[in-house]
């Protein structure tokens, strides 16, 4: 079936169907919630601090301080269940690992600590330092495993295809 549209070339029925489908697709894209994601960049947010606010350089410093000091004051390290005891203290609860040791504070200089205890605490600090995670937060283009394309680009392609369908007899 062929239509005449105001001195434009002949338009076939399948051309009209394709144009209508493209218009419906463009309107669905505009109204969908996926139109919020207009860029296809992946942004990463990195947090290098662990649950108790001690970054890896401070842990390294503490490790070196404990290994080099014999008569100086040392830091007490206690085992804590971080998930149960520290949920309400503005710590990041979304990290992948829970840390089992927390630095409580400085001990009294006169308290006697055996070297084996210090060595054990050093190895535990070292373990905590190795499990510090870098949290990756993906934003924007990847949602439900589908690559989001900018909406303006999709509209441009749809309009181009519609014009090509109109011009081809």
Swiss-Prot record:
Gene Ontology cellular-component annotations: membrane
Keywords: Membrane, Transmembrane, Transmembrane helix
Transmembrane spans: 10-30, 149-169
KW Transmembrane helix (keyword) present: yes
Membrane topology, record value: Multi-pass membrane protein
Cellular compartments annotated: Membrane
Name of the protein in its database record: Putative uncharacterized transmembrane protein DDB_G0280915
Species classification: Eukaryota, Amoebozoa, Evosea, Eumycetozoa, Dictyostelia
